[in-house]
Amino acid sequence: MLRSKLSSLREYLTPINHNSNYETSGEISPEEFVQAGDYLVYKFPTWQWGSAPKKLQKDFLPPDKQFLITKHVPSYQRAQSYLGNTEDLAEDEEELDDGWVKSHRLTHEDPKRDIATDKKVPDIEDLDDFIDEDAEDADGEEFQDLGNSNLRRYDLYITYSTSYRVPKMYLVGFNDNGIPLLPHQMFEDISGDYRDKTATIENLPVSFNTTSVSIHPCKHSSVMKVLMKHAKTSREKAREFEPEAFVTGENLEPATETTQDTGIRVDQYLVVFLKFIASVTPGIGYDYTMDAL
């Protein structure tokens, strides 16, 4: 738990930066984290805001918006069962300098994965060109508890990291009988490519005496910058064909200057964040469908 204590100390000592530099660095401020969280909760009702005990609350966040949580998320298979051979992964993934992989292709579909149908909003033009949709299963699959002894359930928490200025996820798992999983069992649901890079055993920072496994991309902002670069390129190509009306969907105002510059709005940040976390936890079926962009 030494790494957990060091991480907590770093979070405590890092000063809060309220300046917005999302467009240049890919990082977000606490205010932008709240904005992105509101968007996530609106598009995916399975996610909700939570309030931490008073002693654990961060004063730079609203008392009732300390973290995001989705509960009882099913996991039917361990991460290892989603991995193909090394050659297949090498063709489908591009590793960034910080150890993150830009996309993740599953070798087979999970027929029991429960992805809720979300409210429709306009897509970012050509976003699918640079985000691998094979990591998502078809929407609307009916959830069925088949009595599988491999079934696990997870409570997932998203907090704001002051040291990295990005979201940070924590996993708390339970077996099919509701008994908490041990850390080494939760590690079985994390892709081997990331198990030693981004996963850490930590005390859940929004609760007392709860052991969790945290997943925090130390340079997640670098990943966001890559996405913004591709999105901007896609928008520029789209403008060549629709120079006067670069608007998607019905009853929408023209794209804002920020959206035109980055391609991804800051309030959509957590949807993209969850897409990448899905590469780390391929068997955990939380809501992250890219239709929300």
Curated annotation (Swiss-Prot):
Q: Which UniProt keywords apply?
A: Autophagy, Cytoplasm, Protein transport, Transport, Ubl conjugation pathway
Note what the entry says on domains: The N-terminal region is involved in phosphatidylethanolamine-binding and is required for ATG8-PE conjugation. The flexible region (FR) is required for ATG7-binding.
Any one GO CC term of this protein is: cytosol
**Which lineage is the organism of this entry classified under, starting from the top rank?**
Eukaryota, Fungi, Dikarya, Ascomycota, Saccharomycotina
Tell me if Membrane is a UniProt keyword of this record: no
Species this chain originates from: Meyerozyma guilliermondii (strain ATCC 6260 / CBS 566 / DSM 6381 / JCM 1539 / NBRC 10279 / NRRL Y-324)
Quote the catalytic residue positions: C218
Spans annotated as Flexible region: 82-149
Q: Which subcellular locations apply to this protein?
A: Cytoplasm
Regarding protein family, the annotation reads: Belongs to the ATG3 family.
The protein's name in its UniProt record? Autophagy-related protein 3
The molecular function terms in GO held by this entry are: Atg8-family ligase activity
Q: Where is this region: Handle region?
A: 222-268
Q: What does this protein do?
A: E2 conjugating enzyme required for the cytoplasm to vacuole transport (Cvt) and autophagy. Required for selective autophagic degradation of the nucleus (nucleophagy) as well as for mitophagy which contributes to regulate mitochondrial quantity and quality by eliminating the mitochondria to a basal level to fulfill cellular energy requirements and preventing excess ROS production. Responsible for the E2-like covalent binding of phosphatidylethanolamine to the C-terminal Gly of ATG8.
